[in-house]
UniProtKB/Swiss-Prot annotation:
Top-rank taxon, per record: Bacteria
Top-level taxonomy: Bacteria, Bacillati, Bacillota, Bacilli, Lactobacillales
Any Pfam family the entry gives: ACP
Main location: cytoplasm
Keywords from the UniProt entry: Cytoplasm, Phosphoprotein
Locations listed in the record: Cytoplasm
Family: Belongs to the CitD family.
Name of the protein described by the UniProt record: Citrate lyase acyl carrier protein
Residues recorded as bearing O-(phosphoribosyl dephospho-coenzyme A)serine in the entry: S14
Quaternary structure annotation from Swiss-Prot or TrEMBL: Oligomer with a subunit composition of (alpha,beta,gamma)6.
Protein role: Covalent carrier of the coenzyme of citrate lyase.
Cellular component GO terms held in the UniProt record: cytoplasm
Length: 101
């Protein structure tokens, strides 16, 4: 799938993450800013990438600003950003529940 527009989800508050997705033509690029990047950076990137793979999104630039978000928050923010970027308003919860657990 291809993103139709730039989309953002999340906040800059403590224990949250702001995910911004921008369409590109060069593949997946994840730019991460996090105070815990040395400890958890690879795990954060892997979670973001796994959500994008579920939606079959390959050409996207991800700008992620982490403020100590838990795994479930990272996944949720990425899902919301994808739906916004695709211009979808109806969430397919049954499908999401199959692969998010």
């Amino acid at each position: 799938m291809e993103l139709k527009q730039i989309a953002t989800a999340g906040t800059m508050e403590s224990s949250d993450i702001m995910i911004t997705l921008s369409p590109n033509k060069t593949g997946l690029e994840i730019k991460l800013q996090s105070n815990v990047e040395k400890q958890f950076g690879q795990q954060i990137r892997t979670m973001i990438e796994s959500v994008l793979k579920q939606f079959e999104i390959t050409n996207v630039t991800v700008d992620a600003v982490d403020k100590g978000a838990l795994d479930c928050t990272i996944k949720a923010r990425t899902i919301v950003a994808v739906y916004r970027g695709l211009g979808k308003e109806d969430y397919d919860w049954e499908e999401i529940n199959k692969w998010i657990a």
